[in-house]
Amino acid sequence: MKRSRVKVGFGALAVAIGIASVICLHETHGVREAPNASPGPSPEPTLAGGQPDVGEDAPNRPFRVPSGDPARLSCDAARHIVSQVREQLAYTPGPVDAKAFGSAVADWLDPYGLWSVAPDAMTAKSFERGASALLADIEGRGSADCAAAQALGTAVMPWISELRKVFDEARIAGALDDDAWSEATAPVFEGESVTRPAHELAATLGRRLASVVAEYRDAAPYVDVATARYFPSWTSDDWAGVVLASAVRAYVPLLDPHGAWAPLDEESSVYEVDIEAHPPLRLWDTCERTAVGVVIESGAAAPLADGDVVLSLAGVATAGMSLEQIDQLEIAAAEDRLSVDAVVLRGASGLVAVSLHPNRGDTSIASDNAQGPGDLPVDAIAFGESDALVVTISDVRDDLGDELTHGLLRTREHSERPIAGIVLDLRGNGGGSTDGAIDALGLFLPGVPLFPMRRRDGSIETDRAPEPPVVDRWRGPVAALVDANTASAAEMIAGALASYRRGPVVGERTFGKGCAQEHLDDDERAGVLRLTTLLYALPDGKPVQRVGLNPTLRLAFEEPGPHEREADLIHAAPTWRGPDVRDRRVLARIDDGTWAGSWPAHGGHVGPCRDAQVCKALRLLGAPASRARRFVPPKGR
């Protein structure tokens, strides 16, 4: 079966990611070793995690330490969350396809390839047959007590019992011929495509855990936790709750292609775009799930070491955790302000207890990936008798305005030639923060009204660009370079420049994501939502959603853009044309040349450029016959 959990956020292109992958990848940051860290007795593994209060602003609270258990929802809770999603979505929701829903529920239910997605899973047909009834139940159109979830939960129980017998027989048969260390560190779960029969996986788990216990007696408690997670002895009510949580998780992205819901134990997965833009502290770089825990492949922060099998972290056993919970556990542990205990399996040393001090005033643990102000790549490229500054902006972060300000000021201060103009290279930029886009635009359009944004109730909000100090502003020529992968907040930047006739857009038609997402606590305080709550238009009212930006100067790139665009996504928000909110006084000053100058002629002298496409764009901007030489597109809409 193909696993395709869709995870997209504001500014991320809507692509299916095989989230069931056994590899976890991220940045690593240093951790100080505890002075007295030494081998010692292992703490008792636990299946319970902390229960911090849920704040109103979900991103500003620490991630909770996950429990290792899957989320459960009651029938009423599932319905309340679904109702909240349907009511707060920026547009009238369409019908969810029952077949796709059933497949997605089975996928979210099974983090191992054992319970419902394996090719021999006897539960697969149950999910196909029961999908329509389950969908009706969570939408409030079905039975009063969500009987479909109860039926599916009951159907899973005998299958788990059958697999447990296979597991027990393999474990009793004894250890594998391979050494126990190899068995403890060997990856065991498949990635995007699950092709291995569940019976085979159950037997493999049994033999590998038998090998580990035979060699490392102290690991027995962790093996017991692993066994309980792989083959849980839950009641039908327990299973029904897990099915309902999986149903909500499957439902939201099928209704909103940029949306998601995650339980509090896995909420970091809802913020993956934010985490990528602002990397948190980390304890390792890459890892893989094994039968008994998580093996660190690379980038371990001391006192952890590459090759360690992490059996527990912050008192929680790692075996049998979903990838989402492992990721959140590592972030939560690294964010701890005091110390965190871990137990690792370390080759001939056996079980080793270590104490981590992730954030005790040590500046060396600062994010390796975090950019400081002015870290945006800025290239000065010959443009006639002057230089054109080309700024590569790969994503739109909250602090893009500061980054752009510092980067341009630094380059301008050290430039030995006049600056002909600035090109914002937004190719491949999937977007990010609306605040970041608005702040960046303040450098070129200070104080102007920008994007009208409409909510479901018809109310319209309009933000203004900030008014940075005069020394930070750029009144000279500017342009945006875009391609088919330019989306969302990046389209905002390019589109605003064009709407105000401030500068041309060069390249090809953009992705067309004219909607924005917000993070919300669900009404049940059971998890976090990422939901499309706003549709936006350009300052002149032109739509972006499903349409994209048509460049002022077309430039065919050698590598074609993706075939899929926002308009191709199922249940993508509709196109919305907004009011014209432009400041007419600013338009008049731009048109008469008092606000900013036009791109000068380059006389054929451009480059050299590291990227040939950039030189092509610059030649278009300064060509005598180009509209960009005196950029005045048709007025109005």
Model-inferred region functions:
Residues 5, 25-35, 45-89, 99-102, ...:
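C-terminal "post-core" interaction segments
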Residues 301-329, 422-427:
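Conserved PDZ fold ligand-binding element
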Residues 2-28:
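Sec-dependent N-terminal signal peptides
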Residues 230-236, 266-270, 423-432:
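Conserved short loop/turn motifs at secondary-structure junctions
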Residues 298-309, 332-335, 417, 496:
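A short glycine-leucine-enriched loop at secondary-structure breakpoints
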Residues 249-298, 374-380:
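PDZ/PDZ-like peptide-tail recognition elements
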Residues 18, 22-259, 579-637:
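Terminal targeting/pro-maturation regions of precursor/exported proteins
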Residues 255-256, 274-281, 287-292, 304, ...:
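Short flexible coil/turn linkers enriched for glycine and charged/polar residues
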